[in-house]
Curated annotation (Swiss-Prot):
Organism listed in the record: Pseudomonas putida (strain ATCC 47054 / DSM 6125 / CFBP 8728 / NCIMB 11950 / KT2440)
PROSITE patterns: HTH_TETR_2
Gene Ontology terms: biological process: catabolic process
Protein name as it appears in the record: HTH-type transcriptional repressor NicS
Taxonomic classification: Bacteria, Pseudomonadati, Pseudomonadota, Gammaproteobacteria, Pseudomonadales
Keyword check for Transcription: yes
Gene, per the UniProt record: nicS
Induction summary: Expressed at a basal level under non-inducing conditions, but expression increases when the cells are grown in nicotinate as sole carbon source.
Function: Transcriptional repressor for the nicAB operon, encoding the upper aerobic nicotinate degradation pathway. Acts under non-induced conditions: repression of the nicAB operon becomes alleviated in presence of either nicotinate or 6-hydroxynicotinate (6HNA).
GO molecular-function terms, A-Z: DNA binding
Occurrences of domain HTH tetR-type (ranges): 14-74
Phenotype of null mutants: Growth in nicotinate or 6HNA is similar to that of the wild-type strain. Mutant strain shows constitutive levels of nicotinate hydroxylase activity, and these levels are similar to the induced levels detected in the wild-type strain grown in nicotinate. On the contrary, the NicX activity shows the same induction profile than that observed in the parental strain.
Length: 212
């Protein structure tokens, strides 16, 4: 009986922590790190301030956990991809499409990263897990490039980091700046066709950047 009670308490604790984390993602993505308040998060999580400090220690540590959480969620979604390495060019297109679609479907990912960059990566540097998480993300691209090189399709001098930066930046910049650029360029970048055209463009661009 004691074991069952302990198991139930552990599950309740996990749910409470998860609810707080999800609420923090929503609050920080809307208000930023500076504007996001612990009271807002606890209210949204249907918890209380004391529980946030119990599980996370401080607002800063909670934000670091949020950063780790959004990257881990991205990696988990990316890990579900089933890419056919027999066709490296198509696999690359599918990876670019996944990254693009993820940014579109998860605007909180884009806004929280923008917030952290405003703070010059202060909290990211304090994370003990982000480097490992980045390795997982880049690791999905590596076998695609290696397969393309083995078939003589991709250049042998490709830097994996540069290739990943190219793809991530082409997906991220559009989504993080679409509001201002829509006004500046007098183009509705939120338009469905505009987004589809951009995905085609960046997929072609990524391939041209890697081909021999």
């Amino acid at each position: 009986m004691q074991t069952r009670k302990t198991g139930v308490r552990a599950q309740q604790a996990d749910r409470t922590r998860d609810n707080i984390l999800k609420a923090a993602v929503k609050v920080f993505s809307k208000e930023g790190f500076t504007g996001g308040r612990i009271e807002q998060i606890s209210t949204l999580a249907k918890s209380n301030d004391r529980m946030i400090y119990y599980y996370f220690g401080s607002k800063e540590k909670l934000f670091i956990s949020v950063l780790e959480h959004i990257y881990a969620s991205f990696n988990q979604a990316e890990a579900k991809l089933r890419l056919d390495l027999a066709d490296p060019e198509q696999a690359l297109r599918e990876l670019v499409a996944f990254i693009w679609d993820y940014y579109v479907r998860h605007p909180e990912f884009v806004t929280i990263l923008a917030t952290e960059n405003l703070h010059q990566g202060l909290h990211a540097r304090k994370s003990q897990n982000l480097r490992a998480l980045s390795g997982e993300a880049v690791g999905v691209l590596r076998p695609i490039i290696e397969a393309g090189q083995a078939k003589g399709l991709f250049r042998d001098d490709i830097c994996i980091t540069h290739a990943y930066l190219m793809i991530a930046s082409l997906c991220y910049f559009y989504n993080s700046n679409r509001h201002t650029l829509s006004s500046f360029l007098a183009v509705d970048l939120a338009d469905k066709q505009a987004k589809a055209d951009w995905l085609t463009f960046i997929s072609d661009l990524a391939l041209r950047g890697l081909r021999r």
